[in-house]
Amino acid sequence: HSYSSAASDVYKRQINNFDKLKNNVRIPFSDNNFQRLLMIASIGCCVGMSTPQVHIIPLCIDQGLSIITGGKILSIMLFCAVLSRIIFGYISDIIGPLKTLLIGSTLQMITLILFIPFNSITGLYIVSILFGLSQGGIVPSYALIVKKYLPNKDAAERIGLIIFFTIIGMSIGGWMSGKIYDYTNSYSLGFLNSILWNLINVMIIFYI
């Protein structure tokens, strides 16, 4: 019993020391305010992320392409997202998760802009590939940011809250773009709406 108690004390001291080391990485906010900023930012990036993923097939049909072509473009987009999730992991190890998130979100916003003018089959393939390569590492960066900048003792709760808000962003993003299309019969304003939400994310992460 004494050995297990001693081991537990050593473990707790190591955790406390690690938290102290993390506290040396200064952020100009309290832990809770930093958490709130990340939750708001996560909504912004995921509203932007959801529009191509939810609406790429209807967009293709709207441009006179077949549903099969739309499915192929979506599959390639998601495959590229898997690749970028791995690539951005390596990048995060080098430059840190905050900068990685800023780069990924900025690139995602640029590719969202490209969806508006490039609506041919070739253009949609190219832009969808670029979009997939830009967005795969965004959501995992939030977990790494929490682990790096916030206390370990409640990391799981904080990460769970952020992921919850990313899902909210994905949900309302796809819905808003569809609603805008219903009113305008065009996806251009839907993508513009996503770009503006994505810009909110970029501004928050840049501010942090």
Predicted features and spans:
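Single conserved hydrophobic/aromatic residue that forms the stacking wall/gate
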Residues: H1-Y11
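Extracytoplasmic gate region of multi-pass secondary transporters
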Residues: D31-I86
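Interfacial helix-cap and linker-helix signal at transmembrane-aqueous boundaries
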Residues: C60-I61, I91-S92, M176-N185
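Structural signature of the two symmetry-related core transmembrane helices
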Residues: K99-L114
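Intracellular juxtamembrane helix-capping segments at the cytosolic ends
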Residues: G137-L150
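A membrane-interface helix-boundary motif in multi-pass transporters
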Residues: K179-W197
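Multi-pass alpha-helical transporter architecture, strongest
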Residues: N193-I208
